[in-house]
A protein has these predicted regions:
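Adenosine-phosphate binding glycine-rich loop
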Residues: 255-256, 261-304
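Positively charged, low-complexity intrinsically disordered leader regions
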Residues: 1-58, 62
Length: 304
């Protein structure tokens, strides 16, 4: 295992299951919280988010607190990057100040290019452009594993804006490592151009067909901030054709589980009523975020 977590090429199948096991081990006895483990009181962690974040940043901060590490939230708006300092120079300054690990989110696909230049500071990719978000996928795999024992038996359907989702790219990388039975990609063709002829799954433009026989359904929001062209489908038509709701789920397997990496645009890709169904695991994903990120920090510090 690499000393950094940038994408799933850094991980083996054993690494992934070790993360899941360790994350579960951090749960309290009643499984309603996570234990405080003062494992890394001498470690300094900086979070540097060049894009907005709620769940990812907060769960990393709570994870670091639970592990006893020092957590510094880098204020990008008041930094010298606004004076023209490059990202790499800013990170170099952090390294020289003794930062042990940087949790980095960036709007562009740049993280994997320069981490090799840093020998004394580790990196976690907390979201890189539209190409990767490995810790979110580890959380998703942990959540699936709680309900479905064997990945190799799973029919998985992913619905929504696939072309602009970093989550789906990391998920595809990971699921090829742990195994799967089938993957169906579903959404409006404007948002799924890269998946219409995918070598690892089938594209199905009709939601009813895509949901049949699915063991896991992941729905994704439209990433309006990344769209470069106007969609040829209107909002009301999109909701009618692609929203996951109580009615659309009637064709799905009753044992199916429903995921969403967040943030959710309720009333668009997912109805509020569907999110309250027992087989919707969004709350589990949020809860598992803390434990999985505790596991990631622990494993990476053991590689330092």
């Amino acid at each position: 295992m690499s000393k950094n977590l940038i994408n799933f090429s850094d991980l083996t199948k054993k690494d992934i299951f070790d993360f899941i096991e360790l994350a579960n081990n951090f749960k309290s006895e009643d499984s309603l919280n996570y234990r405080d483990e003062n494992l890394f009181p001498d470690k300094k962690i900086v979070s540097m988010f060049c894009e907005p974040s709620t769940r990812t940043k907060l769960s990393f901060q709570i994870a670091a607190h639970n592990l006893g590490a020092k957590f510094i939230d880098f204020d990008l708006s008041n930094s010298s990057m606004n004076k023209g300092e490059s990202l790499e120079d800013t990170l170099s300054a952090m390294e020289m100040m003794g930062v042990d690990l940087c949790i980095l989110r960036h709007t562009e696909s740049v993280i994997h290019d320069f981490v090799k230049n840093f020998s004394n500071m580790q990196f976690i990719n907390a979201g890189e452009g539209s190409i990767s978000h490995p810790t979110q996928t580890l959380i998703d795999l942990m959540t699936i594993h709680e309900s479905k024992e064997k990945f190799e038996n799973l029919n998985i359907t992913i619905v929504g804006d696939l072309d602009h989702s970093r989550v789906v790219n990391s998920f595809i990388e990971a699921i090829q490592i742990v195994g799967y039975k089938s993957i169906t990609f579903c959404g409006h063709p404007d948002l799924c151009k890269n998946f219409i002829e995918s070598p690892i799954g089938n594209f199905e433009p009709e939601l009813d067909t895509a949901l049949q026989d699915a063991d896991v359904v992941m729905t994704l929001r439209i990433q309006n901030e990344r769209l470069s062209e106007k969609l040829t489908i209107g909002a009301s038509d999109y909701v009618e054709r692609y929203q996951i709701n109580v009615d659309s789920l009637q064709v799905a397997d009753p044992e199916m589980i429903l995921l969403h990496p967040g943030p959710v645009n309720f009333g668009i890709e997912l109805s509020k009523e569907a999110s309250e169904l027992e087989n919707c695991k969004i709350r589990n994903q949020i809860f598992n975020g803390v434990g999985m990120r505790m596991a990631v920090l622990t494993k990476l510090f053991s590689q330092a």
